[in-house]
Amino acid sequence: MLHLIYISIIVVLIIILISYTRKPKYFRITAPRSVALFHGIHPLKPKNYKTFSEEFETILNNAIEDGDFKGQLTEPCSYALRGGKYIRPIILMEIVRACQLQHSFGAPIYPAEAALAVEYFHVASLIIDDMPSFDNDVKRRNKDTVWARFGVAKAQMSALALTMQGFQNICRQIDWIKEHCPRFPDPNQLGALLCTFVSHSLNSAGSGQLVDTPEKTIPFFKIAFIMGWVLGTGTIEDIGMIERAAHCFGNAFQLADDIKDHDTDTGWNYAKIHGKRKTFDDVAQSLQECKKILHGKKIYTSIWNEIFQKVINVALGT
């Protein structure tokens, strides 16, 4: 009798595996959410920065309410995520939106889960960066840093929880596409490629944190740009050019930050070495190269003027 049960289980598993390889779109990698992340949002409607920021904040609040973080880590993770500029998820969402004006997959893609992922990864890096063993900062965004408020142990676990949940969000995004976008080409394969790319980028960011270089900033913009491009086009074609655009933007962002921190930074700072004037010129040059690439791919939209101006404002201290 026991052998019969084992054989029955094996047969059922074989049937499931065969069905999965033939019809992967019917199988979820993740459990469905109990609440919708967004209501009444038109994925293809042009938006300004303020509107995108408000939309993402709604998505973030709904994700936290739905239990993205559990137990004692709910409060520190939620605390860390509040009050950001959300520039990385906004970039990702806008690239997806702009790409879909040229590509159709049967239904518009709204990349809510992917946008959450890139913000979770970024905020996890900020928590680590503020720790006593790194920058030893007790203030960020005009409030206590996570470790200063909740302790080192909870801060470390929160960074880990944010990173793990980010990968879960990528998988949820792929599941959402499989359910809603019937003409999206091979979402499982692209999802696997995205997870591999993100893992590599996070490794680069971690290495950058250890030596305090721009490589701790640029990888998160690469994640935003490339995930946006892949989800918006359904392909990895021209991904090298998109990565270059991301590098230029991330470099400009880091250099602008170096100008802002010129008088307070105790570690490596490009503006201290090369001077504020030269650094500002490099910011402008990097943004111009990024703009040229985005124009070439027909994804430079009006919101980029706002995004670029925010980088300039950081450099100017306004």
From Swiss-Prot:
Induction profile: Expressed in the late phase of the viral replicative cycle.
EC annotation from Swiss-Prot or TrEMBL: 2.5.1.-, 2.5.1.1, 2.5.1.29, 2.5.1.10
Keywords in alphabetical order: Host endoplasmic reticulum, Host membrane, Isoprene biosynthesis, Late protein, Magnesium, Membrane, Metal-binding, Transferase, Transmembrane, Transmembrane helix
Cofactor: Mg(2+)
Pathway recorded for this protein: Isoprenoid biosynthesis; farnesyl diphosphate biosynthesis; farnesyl diphosphate from geranyl diphosphate and isopentenyl diphosphate: step 1/1; Isoprenoid biosynthesis; geranyl diphosphate biosynthesis; geranyl diphosphate from dimethylallyl diphosphate and isopentenyl diphosphate: step 1/1; Isoprenoid biosynthesis; geranylgeranyl diphosphate biosynthesis; geranylgeranyl diphosphate from farnesyl diphosphate and isopentenyl diphosphate: step 1/1
Binding site for Mg(2+) 1: D129, D135
Subcellular location per the Swiss-Prot or TrEMBL entry: Host endoplasmic reticulum; Host membrane
Enzyme category, top tier: transferase
Family membership: Belongs to the FPP/GGPP synthase family. Asfivirus trans-prenyltransferase subfamily.
Protein's name in the database: Trans-prenyltransferase
Species in which this protein is naturally found: African swine fever virus (isolate Tick/South Africa/Pretoriuskop Pr4/1996)
